[in-house]
Amino acid sequence: MNSLAVQLHQLFNAQKRFTFPFEANKNEIPTNGIYIIFEKGETFNGCDRIIRVGTHTGDNQLYSRLKQHFVKENKNRSIFRKNIGRSLLRKDDPHHPYAEKWEYDTTSREGKQKYAHLLDVNFEKALEKRISEYIQQNLSFVVFEVKTKDDRLFWESRIISTLSNAAKAGEIKPSENWLGSYSPNEKIRESGLWLVNELYKQSLNDEEFEKLKNLVKGK
């Protein structure tokens, strides 16, 4: 029998896939749920390999969260975008002179006062554009409805842990050319996931996977 990591990939590879632009498909994206992202060139056991799992905490925010990742050019609102930017910088130059400034967060008033004058706005805009192009050209996703915050966080954690534990055991491996291999974050490099939270916790068991299957299929 296939491992749960394989079964997870088979389950999500069989669902309706969305790519950018997805505005026309807004009515097919549940208001509350979990997204599963795939990346071109990444495969596992004959399937497209899952490279990120995510959700939202506020009510009715799934579509908005996807837009923050795919469209809105502001890495301070999307750690996913920030991590892709980190990898692009280090792919360009392992000791990129702008890498430290890319970490600055100017979302708060304090952050603006402390860091805004240090930033190269044109460089950041150009990098944000590169991030958007990378995401829009290379990533696709599936979604499934999970109505409550607690359930979303539970299933997100179980799925991430199942995948990362399989990576830790050597079952899942990123391709040699995976952009995440340039990440300064060891967790991203080792897990093969654009994630640093919920890694290596409790994996799904068989009973939970059956429940998840029904949830994904809308039963």
Q: Where are each of the predicted segments found?
A:
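GIY-YIG nuclease catalytic motif and its immediate N-terminal context
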Residues: 1-130, 134-219
